Structures are given as C-alpha cells and as structure tokens.
Amino acid sequence: MHALERISLDAYLPVYGPAAIDVGAATCLRAPHAPESPMLNRVVGLGVDGPVDEAQLDGALTAMGDTSFYVAISPSADASLDGLLQARGLEPGWGWMLFERGPSPAPSVETALQIVEVDAGTLDAWATVVATAYGLPDDSLPWFAAIPEATAWHAFLALDGDEPAAAAAVWIDEHAAYFGMAGTVPEHRGKGGQGALFAARIERALAAGCTTLVTETGELRDGSPSSSYRNIRRYGFEERFVVAHRLRPYRRG
C-alpha cells in the first residue's frame, strides 16, 4: 500500500472503531447507518501485499453485508484484482484522486465567515453540515458527531453570523495530516468557507510539525474538476495518483 493510502486508512480507523474489521490483508470499513453510501462503506488493501487470495476476497465481500460499497483497487494492487471483482458482478465505480502537499503556508483567503474549532456546543451543528452535504441519513448524525472527539481528529466550523455554513476536519499523527469531512450548506456556497477551512487546517497541521499533508476527492470526470477538486489544487495540493474502485450496489432486503 502506498504511503498516502496508508495515511488515509490510518485516519479513518479510529472513526470506524469496531465497525472496521480485517479480513486477511484487507480492511472492511463498514457504516451500517448509511447502507447506501459507498463513500462510507469500502474495502481497502486487497492484493497490495501479493497475489489476491480469493477466499479472503470473498470473505471481505461477505463482511460488507448488503450495503452499497466500493472495493479500492490500489495502483500497486495485483493485476488480477479488477478482473476478479468484475467476475463477481461488481461494477466500475468512481475513482478517488489522492493529493499531497508539503509544509508551505496556506494562501491567504478573504471571507466574511468566522472559522471556529468545534467544541461540545457545536458538535451537532458540525455533524449536521457534513451529513447534509453528502446527502446522508439522519441515522449517521451520531457517527459524525463522534468524529471531532475521535483520536487525532480536529474539526472546524465556518459560521455566517450564528448560522453554520461549512465544516471540515483534519487528522494529525506525528508528521502526517489527512484532510477530510468537508461539506458546505448549499445556500452558503461561494462564500469562501472551504478555502478558509483549508487555511485553518493547514495552519493547524504545520503548527503540529506535519510535513506530509494528504487529501482525496473524486477523480476528474469528462475533464471538468469539481469545486472540491479546484479548492484542493488552489490550496497547494498536487495530484499524485488515482485509486480506482469497483462498486457493489445496495441490496435491498
């Protein structure tokens, strides 16, 4: 597994807690509160340490239950993995571009929004912004609300007056930082919230001595970057590689 993929996985393991299980060399990240979200339900690590063990592959697929989930196909994965997943009925999914930046200061940003670090009084507001931005069910709110208190995560909220406008978080461990959980309330888009949140998180990571800053988002489609992709580039992150995905759609009982 590439070092950037390892950072991403290490960041999310404390978020999933016991819902993250190992099946051989694979890690199954399971979010039963959001069974139709392949963004939250993923299998990572298959075939990266050697040839694919088909028994372990089938065990990992079984462990995901009836959720809609992605299976990550690392650039370093065994070449047979994609075909084995296709043979089991998994469809092509949306790959994720991994980005990296060094320890240079963040570009300046102008916004009327106020950036605050999340505390006990703003946990629920932060969780609501993130869940709403990704179209996730209310059942996911307690899961998101626990993230700012999870090991090594630091969460920030952008406020328009007293109204939550955007949210994001950064995981910091030794010299690595992972940027994730970013979302904006639709009516507050275009106000510079995510830019200001990037700047705040970069500042926090640099203050902690981080030298490798990592994030990811959906790969380019039709050559047109999303607003998330543009913001990532704007704040100094450089494209590194795409982790492809195979998708198994949600199975309704």
Language model regions located:
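Conserved acetyl-CoA-binding loop-helix of GNAT-fold acetyltransferases
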Residues: 53-61, 181-184, 190-207, 230, ...
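A conserved beta-strand-loop-helix scaffold within acyl/acetyltransferase catalytic domains
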Residues: 137-187
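Conserved beta-hairpin
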Residues: 19-24, 77-91, 152-168
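Short amphipathic alpha-helix that is part of the acyltransferase structural core
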Residues: 1-7, 42-49, 96, 105-143, ...
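N-terminal charged segments
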Residues: 1-63, 144
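Acyl-donor-binding surface of acyltransferase catalytic domains
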Residues: 48-114, 118-119, 215, 221, ...
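Conserved acetyl-CoA binding element of GNAT-fold acetyltransferases
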Residues: 36-48, 175-186, 245
